[in-house]
């Protein structure tokens, strides 16, 4: 495993972490709506990648992880756009309560390197 410490002076991506609680019994509909909504977010300037993770212990809880080039790409570029209004129409009626959204910057990054021919 390789681990590196990032420096503030380095250009680092921002990780948006949204904790989503979906109304009971609406998970399948939420996931279907998200399959459409992800096309919106992935088209935004500054977008890098995203993952939607479902909690194993709490079936109505999800984590949305979005990497942005800069904080402002999310907080201004996306949140103040018409595309965000479209995103909200598709998804926000599923949430109970309102999602918690936080932003993180890397401190340590570790990566397991897999060598060719190794199982």
Language model: regions and residue ranges:
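Glycine-rich beta-strand-turn "strand-cap" elements at beta-sheet edges
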Residues: 2-11, 51-58, 88-119
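Generic structural motif
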Residues: 23-25, 71, 106
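Residue-level signal for secondary-structure boundary sites
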Residues: 28, 72-74, 109
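Conserved GNAT-fold acetyl-CoA-binding loop/helix
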Residues: 31, 35, 82
